[in-house]
Amino acid sequence: MTNDIAILKVEGLTVYQGSYLAVRDVSFELLPGTDTAIVGPNGAGKSTLVKAVLDLIPRSSGTIQIFGRPIARLGRLRHLLGYMPQNFIFDRSFPISVSELVGLGWDKEAKKGDLFFSRLWRQDREKSAAVGEALRRTDAYHLQHQAIGTLSGGQLKRVLLAYCLVMPRKLLVLDEAFAGVDVQGAADFYALLNELKRQEGWTVLQVSHDIDMVNRHCDRVLCLNQSIVCTGKPEIALSPQNLLATYGPGFSRYQHQH
């Protein structure tokens, strides 16, 4: 971490879905260069929280700041934010290749006068080179000419992550990004996230069901069940007592591993 300025700051966030209280009075912040996981049972509001933080769904109350600005006023800084949703719904008959999809994440205007971009990447970097490197980093380069409608679930996850990597980001938000990926694939993903965090200064916020992987790889954990049950380093937040308070009786951490 290079400083104590929060990349993301959430205060008093409450979200209703109709008359249902999905998220209640959630506050937390992310410091630069950290990987924070949100864990909790099904229906706990994890995906709802992430969508509200990104201003994708309305919130009932609360404030959200990203890069020190209100989320609604991000403007041109929005390209420094990457998001990989839990479910990517698309028409499988749509004629677009993997490389074309990843290329949609490239913003040629973003690099103009952007010091963050200039420091990490060459100014003369071409879109095709950026797409190729993103696919290599996610072990999906061999899929570049394949139609996205023919991809398996695991392959699509790699391609969507490449879409996020085609531009340098300061904050990467992942919603169950590794669900359905085999053990080796998940390990590869976490190794890549660690590289992005340590070498390039990315900050990661992820929703995950895999308690074991979170315990081994994340810096902080936020246990959620509508409201925050606990938060802290994995060895504290994932204690048996805290997991019981979060998931309820009958919980076994081994049910939440690959």
Residue ranges: model-predicted function:
Residues 147-151:
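Conserved ABC ATPase signature
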Residues 220-234:
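H-loop (His-switch) and adjacent beta-strand-loop-beta switch element
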Residues 103, 115-143:
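Conserved ABC ATPase "signature" region
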Residues 172-176:
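Catalytic Walker B motif of ABC-type/P-loop ATPase nucleotide-binding domains
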Residues 208-209:
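H-loop/switch region of ABC-family ATPase nucleotide-binding domains
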Residues 62-79:
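Conserved ABC transporter NBD signature motif
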Residues 54:
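Helix-to-loop junction immediately C-terminal to a conserved catalytic motif
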